[in-house]
Regions:
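An acidic/histidine-cluster motif and surrounding catalytic segment
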Residues: 2-117, 121-272
Length: 272
């Protein structure tokens, strides 16, 4: 667990939050309506940030068979590399629906820049001051930017060697990754505080442009991917122009749950 800012709402707003308030058209925190304790913790962690709570789709209100019958959910063509498990849990489906609804709302409302957080997000005190610089470095054509993520923040030589191996054998059909995907697995340098995004997990903190939201909503209709796997698929297949803040600016309460799916909506808010 990383360091965190715990600033009561009445205290001075951190400069990074002031910058984010000015930059984003909307800042949403995805959270179950019944997650009252998490919502209360946000008041201290995000003091000064002008965010709106977005009621997540609750797994208790979902029926897998009905969703499939209605054409709202279909992961029959989702490849194994973009699955956390054989079939998405109801919680993961609820998480995916929640994020997709935000994308749809963004497009319909005409917002240019939206920040999406989840209710277990933790600002990383040591790096958060770099947020204004990272935002300034985004090119006009950006569509997605991770502000926080799990996996591939620091790249070991062994991991780079593994990527080269995947890239070499992918054309032979010997890898789970296709050639273009293998080349995009690891983040690449871009600017002092940004990298071109690679394969990252979690959706606890990211920004999206209107065009990025339009693309993500279309790719997730019907729901076929966990929320974070949707972003991964779009990035590795070159469908979206994505960046990642480096170092990451936000963490989660429980990073150990990240490999399964987004900790907030995919486990406590939704896991089966």
């Amino acid at each position: 667990m990383s360091d965190a800012i715990h600033a009561p709402a009445g205290d001075a707003t951190p400069p990074a939050f002031e910058a984010l308030n000015r930059w984003a058209d909307r800042i949403f925190v995805v959270s179950l309506a019944r997650a009252t304790e998490r919502r209360e913790r946000l008041r201290g962690r995000l003091g000064g940030l002008r965010y709106e709570l977005f009621d997540a789709v609750d797994k208790r209100d979902l029926d897998r068979e009905r969703l499939a019958r209605d054409g709202a959910y279909d992961e029959s063509r989702t490849r194994a590399p973009y699955r956390h498990r054989q079939d998405m849990s109801l919680g993961a489906i609820g998480c995916a629906l929640s994020h997709r609804k935000l994308y749809e709302d963004m497009v319909a409302s005409g917002w240019d820049r939206m920040v999406v957080l989840e209710d277990d997000v933790i600002p990383r005190a040591s790096t958060l001051p770099l947020l204004p610089e990272a935002l300034r470095e985004l090119p006009p054509s950006w569509e997605l930017c991770y502000l926080g993520y799990w996996q591939n923040e620091d790249i070991s030589p062994g991991r780079r060697l593994k990527q080269l191996t995947y890239a070499a054998i992918a054309p032979l059909g010997l890898s789970r990754w296709r050639p273009g995907e293998a080349l995009r697995l690891l983040p690449r340098g871009f600017s002092p505080h940004l990298r071109r995004a690679g394969r990252h997990m979690c959706t606890h903190a990211y920004a999206v442009s209107r065009e990025g939201a339009r693309k993500l909503a279309a790719l997730q209709t019907p729901v076929a991917y966990a929320a974070d796997q949707l972003l991964t698929m779009a990035i590795l297949q070159g469908r979206i122009e994505a960046y990642a803040a480096y170092p990451a600016l936000f963490d989660q309460e429980s990073m150990e749950h990240s490999a399964a799916h987004s900790a907030t909506i995919g486990t406590e808010v939704g896991g089966e």
